[in-house]
Curated annotation (Swiss-Prot):
This protein's name: Plastin-3
Chain positions found as Phosphoserine: 268, 293, 326, 339
Binding-site list for Ca(2+) 2: 65, 67, 69, 71, 76
Region (Actin-binding 1): 109-382
GO cellular component, one term: plasma membrane
Its job: Actin-bundling protein.
Region of interest (Actin-binding 2), residue spans: 383-627
């Protein structure tokens, strides 16, 4: 495309377009493809029939994709906004982007800013998140310097600037992610703040937050849309942690006639929440809802839900809480919503939404409101049904969780909730190939929504293509692995593919830093030992299976060699170590690695148990950080 199109745009407009582009480009590969457009319209929650959305996307791809490579580059995106500005299609596209979380109003045109959708969206999120964080951290002595924040000012954007609140919120969502001993709480110089923000961002990444576009400087500057985007991911991970069958067997009460436990386990947390709300609504004789936006605007479903889940005082030591339904017949929507929220308050669940958020059907905040209700009062009984195979509910292994978090942190779409079920159409695997510089021909890929008939065939074709790419050009070892195995969700064989993707991703980072020199296990081990001895450390490693790694001393020493003086050796145990000592060392080592800027996905247990694959990623990430020393 010629440069002409971008010349008449002001720098501010160009920055806004870049920001908008990043919001649509979910996997951050620099291009927008049609499934990302589908996702955009789905998230924007616009009152458009499905065929209309498909029509708009088709038109955008035809008009925007000028070099016909099946995707829209940034220049083509700019062209859409300039040349197609006045068309209805472009207006709808703009509206969808403005409704997606964020803060800039595209193009700065009066029609857009007068709608004010964007600004008011994030104001509401800010208000909701501030109240949630205030409550969560009200008794934490380390946060007294910023808590409570005023939800009506910009307190939040200043409060996250030193990294402490972010670290605390990450630990509330996934306990023990960050070793408290690694958080700098005193004498907060700019350098020390930078370390806290590294720790927060790399830990957020390790629990599955997509932080590719966020840097420590963005958080220090309190950039609102980035702060809110990151906080929402952290809060959501915490809210959704228990909406999962292996952690909450009573969810099996939501099984429908003829449905297997396996089918129920494939649902996302959002789908399970909707199923849960409808289970209680059916029991109350009220109609079902299809979403947490348009269908809850009148608060009537919420009244019935609260009435169903409120404790009836029948169990030992359970206080009875009566829900007053008189507000149900209030004629004014806002007053009805306020009356409903007063009842939610009796349950200690007046969180995330204001009456206006309910009436406007804000999907994100209403989802959070319902998730919080579920966590406090699920009101489900585990079925004593004989024909349920409870052995299926083993829950994911640590390794599976690490792989899943790694994928999600790279921004794959759809979000991976269940490692095997969510990879059965290979879309996520194909996106990961792009991340490891294996080109994917997206015109060969079948994308959802799949047809009712033959859906599995379409998914299998994708899986076959994924295996084909793995053999060549990726040169993976895939002996005995076929597309059918991915499509079946075969755990061992799917893991074999996923591990090779993660390994290649890790090595690519090193090769980029080492001017393209090939990296492998021996090179990493040699670098580790050389760096340790040059820093005068007595530790060394033979290989990634070396049993001495279980003390984490080699990792701790390597961190101190990369950034001299950063380790507080008073906190590190050596000599004859108990299991607790080993675990404490490993926890400190992983957090300190993240604090000095290494994006470590492995868990402390991986070091203690010397899991060679994960140990390799730890040393490779540290080598990457070590090579960045200027």
């Amino acid at each position: 495309m010629d440069e002409m199109a971008t010349t008449q745009i002001s720098k501010d407009e160009l920055d806004e377009l870049k920001e908008a582009f990043a919001k649509v480009d979910l996997n951050s590969n620099g291009f927008i493809c049609d499934y990302e457009l589908h996702e955009l319209f789905k998230e924007a929650n616009m009152p458009l029939p499905g065929y209309k959305v498909r029509e708009i996307i088709q038109k955008l791809m035809v008009d925007g994709d000028r070099n016909k490579d099946g995707k829209i580059s940034f220049n083509e995106f700019v062209y859409i906004f300039q040349e197609v500005k006045s068309s209805d299609i472009a207006k709808t596209f703009r509206k969808a982007i403005n409704r997606k979380e964020g803060i800039c109003a595209l193009g700065g045109t009066s029609e857009l800013s007068s709608e004010g959708t964007q600004h008011s969206y994030s104001e509401e999120e800010k208000y909701a998140f501030v109240n949630w964080i205030n409550k969560a951290l009200e008794n934490d002595p380390d946060c007294r310097h910023v808590i409570p924040m005023n939800p009506n000012t910009d307190d939040l954007f200043k409060a996250v600037g030193d990294g402490i609140v972010l670290c605390k919120m990450i630990n509330l969502s996934v306990p023990d992610t960050i070793d408290e001993r690694a958080i700098n709480k005193k004498k907060l110089t700019p350098f020390i703040i930078q370390e806290n923000l590294n720790l927060a961002l790399n830990s957020a990444s390790a629990i599955g937050c997509h932080v590719v576009n966020i840097g420590a400087e963005d958080l220090r500057a309190g950039k609102p849309h980035l702060v809110l985007g990151l906080l929402w991911q952290i809060i959501k991970i915490g809210l959704f942690a228990d909406i999962e069958l292996s952690r909450n067997e009573a969810l099996a009460a939501l099984l429908r006639d003829g449905e297997t436990l396996e089918e129920l386990m494939k649902l996302s947390p959002e789908e399970l929440l909707l199923r849960w709300a409808n289970f209680h609504l059916e029991n109350s004789g009220w109609q079902k809802i299809n979403n947490f936006s348009a269908d809850i605007k009148d608060s009537k479903a919420y009244f019935h839900l609260l009435n169903q889940i409120a404790p009836k005082g029948q169990k030992e030591g359970e206080p009875r809480i009566d829900i007053n339904m008189s507000g149900f017949n209030e004629t004014d929507d806002l007053k009805r919503a306020e009356s409903m929220l007063q009842q939610a308050d009796k349950l200690g669940c007046r969180q995330f939404v204001t009456p206006a958020d309910v009436v406007s059907g804000n999907p994100k905040l209403n989802l959070a409101f319902v998730a919080n209700l579920f966590n406090k009062y699920p009101a489900l009984t585990k079925p004593e049904n004989q024909d349920i195979d409870w052995t299926l509910l083993e829950g994911e292994t640590r390794e599976e969780r690490t792989f899943r978090n790694w994928m999600n942190s790279l921004g794959v779409n759809p979000h991976v909730n269940h490692l095997y079920a969510d990879l059965q159409d290979a879309l996520v695997i194909l996106q990961l190939y792009e991340r490891i510089k294996v080109p994917v021909d997206w015109s060969k890929v079948n994308k959802p929504p799949y047809p009712k008939l033959g859906a599995n065939m379409k998914k299998l074709e994708n899986c076959n293509y994924a295996v084909e790419l793995g053999k060549n050009p990726a040169k993976f070892s895939l002996v005995g692995i076929g597309g059918q195995d991915l499509n079946d969700g075969n755990p061992t064989l799917t893991l074999a593919v996923v591990w090779q993707l993660m390994r290649r991703y890790t090595l690519n980072v090193l090769e980029d830093l080492g001017e393209g020199q090939k990296a492998n296990d021996d090179i990493i081990v040699n670098w580790v030992n050389r760096t340790l001895s040059e820093a005068g450390k007595s530790t060394s490693i033979q290989s990634f299976k070396d049993k001495t790694i279980s003390s984490s001393l080699a990792v701790v020493d390597l961190i101190d060699a990369i950034q001299p003086g950063c380790i507080n050796y008073d906190l590190v145990k050596s000599g004859n170590l108990t299991e607790d000592d080993k675990h404490n060392n490993a926890k400190y080592a992983v957090s300190m690695a993240r604090r000095i800027g290494a994006r470590v996905y492995a868990l402390p247990e991986d070091l203690v148990e010397v899991k060679p694959k994960m140990v390799m990623t730890v040393f490779a990430c540290l080598m990457g950080r070590g090579m960045k020393r200027v």
